[in-house]
C-alpha cells in the first residue's frame, strides 16, 4: 500500500468536515431567509420562495454527499485496519494506527508512543512502506 493510499482516510475526513461546515452555513442562511420580518408591504412571494427552495435543494444534495462520504470513510477505515493488522511489528502497527487511522501528526504519534522523536516514527513508517513496496515489485 502506498503512502497516498494510507492517507486517503485523513483527506476524506477533511472533506467531510468541510462539507459539514458548508451544510451548517446553508442551513443558517436558509433560516435567515425564512425568518424575514413581515412588514405589511406587498411583496412577491416567488422570490423568497424560490430562494428557500434553492437552499433546501442544495441542503438535501449536500446531506446526500456527506452521507456517501461517511460510508466511503467507513470502508476506507476498514481497509486500513485490515492492512495494519497484517503488520508483524507491534510498534509499527501502533505508528500506522495513530497516524493513518487517528490522523495524528508525527509529533503527536511520537509523544503518544513515548521514547521516540517525530522523525524516528516517520522513518519507521516510511521504511516499512518502502520494504513492502519492494517486495511487491520483486
Which residues does each PLM region occupy?
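Short acidic/histidine-centered micro-motifs embedded in hydrophobic/aromatic stretches
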Residues: 29, 98, 112
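Short alpha-helical "recognition helix" segments of helix-turn-helix
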Residues: 107-111
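Short amphipathic alpha helix immediately N-terminal
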Residues: 88-102
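Short, conserved sequence motifs enriched in acidic/basic residues, glycine, and aromatics
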Residues: 86-87, 115
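Residue-level signal for the short linker/turn that defines the boundary of a DNA-recognition helix
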Residues: 103-105, 116
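N-terminal interaction/assembly modules
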Residues: 1-83, 134-138
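DNA major-groove recognition helix of helix-turn-helix
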Residues: 125, 129
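Short, basic interhelical loop/turn and adjoining N-cap
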Residues: 113-124
Amino acid at each position: 500500500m502506498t503512502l497516498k493510499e494510507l492517507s486517503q482516510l485523513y483527506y476524506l475526513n477533511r472533506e467531510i468536515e468541510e462539507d459539514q461546515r458548508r451544510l451548517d452555513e446553508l442551513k443558517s442562511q436558509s433560516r435567515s431567509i425564512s425568518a424575514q420580518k413581515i412588514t405589511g408591504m406587498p411583496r412577491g412571494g416567488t422570490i423568497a420562495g424560490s430562494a428557500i427552495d434553492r437552499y433546501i435543494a442544495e441542503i438535501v444534495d449536500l446531506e446526500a454527499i456527506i452521507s456517501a462520504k461517511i460510508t466511503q470513510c467507513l470502508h476506507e477505515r476498514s481497509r486500513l485496519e485490515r492492512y495494519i493488522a497484517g503488520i508483524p511489528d507491534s510498534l509499527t502497527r501502533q505508528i500506522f494506527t495513530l497516524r493513518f487511522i487517528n490522523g495524528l501528526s508525527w509529533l503527536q504519534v511520537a509523544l503518544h508512543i513515548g521514547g521516540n522523536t517525530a522523525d524516528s516514527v516517520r522513518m519507521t513508517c516510511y521504511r516499512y512502506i518502502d520494504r513492502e513496496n519492494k517486495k511487491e515489485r520483486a
